Amino acid sequence: MNKVLITGATGQTASYLVEYILKNHPEYEIHCTRRWRSREENIESFKDKVIWHDVEMKDYFNVFGVMNKIRPDRVFIYSASSYVRDSWAQPWIYMEENVSHAMHVFNSVLMINNIDFETLQVKLDYNPKIFVALSSEEYGKVPWGTQLTEDSPLAPSSPYGVSKVALDLMAKVMYESY
């Protein structure tokens, strides 16, 4: 059976993804992460239909433990601090959380594959597809009606946007390197 891991599944966007997969891909075993303090209003429709893992995504060993235990075929990283206005008050939290959550997933895959950190050689016996949730905030303030593509210039205008650009670039580096 194919396994999917969705981090931050109690959030608005990730909860829609869970509902979509449940409806359209019943062949998937769905694993979701949540924090002990997660609000549950977005998950009422599927709370008992998925396998929950209480994970603090800032804690690498928590993330590694879940990744190593279930070895998902696909990982959707939605866990993040996502309030643009609040990012101005605590920009370091946004940078740390929004990048480290994904880095812990990436590094878990490398560790499961026994990467040699001296030579950076890794034999990818376990190679899940990893999807990272990004944001239009990466492009900053653009004129109304402007069509954005992945090739549009990155010009974040908030600490939250900067954290998502850093995440975007790190995901690209990891993809191209491994």
Task: List each model region and its residues.
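N-terminal Rossmann-like NAD(P)+-binding domain of SDR-like oxidoreductases, especially those catalyzing
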Residues: 1-178
